[in-house]
Amino acid sequence: MSDDTTQIEPAMAQETSPRANTRKVFVKTYGCQMNVYDSQRMADSLAAEGYVATDTPDDADLVLLNTCHIREKASEKLYSALGRLRKMKDARAADGKELTIGVAGCVAQAEGQEILRRAPNVDLVIGPQTYHRLPNALARVRGGEKVVETDYAIEDKFEHLPAPRREETRKRGVSAFLTVQEGCDKFCTFCVVPYTRGSEVSRSVKQIVAEAERLADSGVRELTLLGQNVNAWHGEGEDGREWGLGELLFRLARIPGIARLRYTTSHPRDMDDSLIAAHRDLRQLMPYLHLPVQSGSDRILKAMNRRHKADEYLRLIERIRNVRPDMALSGDFIVGFPGETDQDFEDTMQLVRDVNYAQAYSFKYSPRLGTPGADLDDHVEEAVKDERLQRLQALLSAQQYAFQDSMIGRKMDVLLEKPGREAGQMVGRSPWLLPVIIDDNKDRVGDIIHVKIVSTGTNSLIAQKLA
């Protein structure tokens, strides 16, 4: 879970269409890993139509903003960006040129026509379930329409999205995201996901394996399976029956070239025996698990409709660590949910101490329009939220630094991902997701090398290569 913004690198081949030099697209991505994946798939779809990616909106013919709706100020962040683009569009029009502006993602799904009302300079609004219709929607825009595509599609969008070209995948790196599940049926009272991403939908094993094999053939070594509630994945298996995520992981581990597997984000209620067995038996499944709990108070967990108690979460963590003692945990926390008392917050602090997280995200509660939480009374004062968040983040930061320090002296395998900032350096990824910096000018990106951790940096590890 993150509020980071990224942009899609200009990785699309230019020789595939006679129009390739005349249409350029800039994609700005806000929010989670699934939005990054979605932006890549939209870029792949546009590449098939002759669009070339650019790393700046200044020379783009099409600007797509792929939005996130998790945080309170997500919409205002969007409209601020659209205000800047309006000036750019007006300047283009004064020179007799065009700029097409599109809004995608969860804000697009949530607000739809309202975006066109507030920002008339927008030409296209498209929700996550209709990205396969993007080329057709743009054709309608070129015909003079203002297009809003936010209906939930009957057809399977993944069946209609073009596969990425091998060269494009190579340029994206040796680690890749692969969406296997979308939507959520849990309806936590604070969360907009069921309303913006819809009910849970699982891709078939056939689809997932085909995409994973294409990624492996293009040099991908590490796959992270994505879903709003990824461990609720239950797709049609190769034998015709319904599989769970544990079975899927065992199948993906058989693909040549795939050396590492991860998945995110999970719900405690959906950690079943098969998935725990995968953590025990699969060497490719990395010992790092993002398992949000949100609160350590049973009373608040019930108000959030989390469907589990704090002690059930702790027992689950114990089960996982019993089969994988080196497992590191990350989580999400919300402070200041309506009705949260001092004791409720202290229960959260105690749970954090009991789990001892390697990393966690924490936020002040902000009501999201249309969710049950927005209708709750007994709101916590902002000053109290601020104080609680500060205390929680101090504890989580101390745990994070202690976890990093515990790596010093340890030997581990590291997947090399890119050259470092300094000459002769490489940057890799540890099994626990931490970046690892190594003085190494002999190995290549995609190699897995054995190292010893000698010190820590800011959110990174420093290592020496072992013979």
UniProtKB/Swiss-Prot annotation:
Its EC number is 2.8.4.3. One of its GO terms (cellular component) is cytosol. It is found in: Cytoplasm. Residues 1-20 are annotated as: Disordered. SUPFAM superfamilies: Radical SAM enzymes. It is an enzyme of class 2 (transferase). [4Fe-4S] cluster 1 binds at C32, C68, C106. It catalyses: N(6)-dimethylallyladenosine(37) in tRNA + (sulfur carrier)-SH + AH2 + 2 S-adenosyl-L-methionine = 2-methylsulfanyl-N(6)-dimethylallyladenosine(37) in tRNA + (sulfur carrier)-H + 5'-deoxyadenosine + L-methionine + A + S-adenosyl-L-homocysteine + 2 H(+). Residues 23-143 form the MTTase N-terminal domain. InterPro entries: Elp3/MiaA/NifB-like_rSAM, Methylthiotransferase, Methylthiotransferase_CS, Methylthiotransferase_N, Methylthiotransferase_N_sf, MiaB_methiolase, rSAM, rSAM_horseshoe. Its cofactor is [4Fe-4S] cluster. Residues 405-467 form the TRAM domain. The keyword Heme does not apply. Its main location: cytoplasm. PROSITE patterns: MTTASE_N, MTTASE_RADICAL, RADICAL_SAM, TRAM. CDD domains: Radical_SAM (cd01335). GO terms for molecular function: 4 iron, 4 sulfur cluster binding; metal ion binding; N6-isopentenyladenosine methylthiotransferase activity. [4Fe-4S] cluster 2 binds at C184, C188, C191. HAMAP family: tRNA_metthiotr_MiaB. NCBIfam families: miaB-methiolase, MiaB/RimO family radical SAM methylthiotransferase. Belongs to the methylthiotransferase family. MiaB subfamily. Catalyzes the methylthiolation of N6-(dimethylallyl)adenosine (i(6)A), leading to the formation of 2-methylthio-N6-(dimethylallyl)adenosine (ms(2)i(6)A) at position 37 in tRNAs that read codons beginning with uridine. This is tRNA-2-methylthio-N(6)-dimethylallyladenosine synthase. The lineage of its organism: Bacteria, Pseudomonadati, Pseudomonadota, Alphaproteobacteria, Hyphomicrobiales.
